[in-house]
Amino acid sequence: WTLSRGLGDVYKRQDDKVYIVLDNTPFYAESGGQIGDIGVIENKDFSAKVVDTQKNGDFIIHICSLVSGNILENMNVSCKIDSIRRKDIKINHSATHLLHQALKDVLGNHINQAGSLVHPDYLRLDVTHPSKIDTKDITAIELLVNNKIAENISVETDIQSLEDAKKEGATALFCLLYTSDAADEL
């Protein structure tokens, strides 16, 4: 995936990393437990390897190692995301949702997500539960998740209001990320 973007701001830090802010970006910044994209930002004058993507307020910061050339402000650039890594992250993102639902199905609706880490190689899901999960329940949870994966259901994206999503059965996991008063609405 390659998109041309205008280079906004470039910052060089003491750690030899280059911090790039673009006017727009296809890179996903770390958020909600999901790690940020990596890839390449380049043009005919330079190449920079994006080693991490972070949010800082309203800005997306591309943390890069300069491979070659020099970067100047207001250059047009091409952005290339590591699409294989992103695909693996998407798979583990979906698996987090499957695991969360399986935990609710086996242990009860009191289970809520307290945090997560979505990485290309693994995932971690932190949940609230008053006791240790026994081996029998772990086996049942595994079976539910594996059966759902085996169904090979296509993933569909539908952008809608929080209210409409809740009417269709969506679960708001981190209420305050949706709206400031979303917790009162659940």
Predicted regions, residues:
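Single conserved hydrophobic/aromatic residue that forms the stacking wall/gate
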Residues: 1-11, 178-186
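Conserved nucleotide-binding/hydrolysis modules and their immediate coupling elements
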Residues: 4-5, 9-79, 84
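Hydrophobic alpha-helical scaffolding
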Residues: 27-31, 54, 64-67, 71, ...
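Active/ligand-binding-proximal structured segments within catalytic/core domains
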Residues: 28-41, 72-127
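Secondary-structure transition/capping motifs at alpha-helix termini
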Residues: 42-44, 69-72, 105-113, 133-136, ...
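Non-catalytic interaction/regulatory segments
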Residues: 120, 124-180
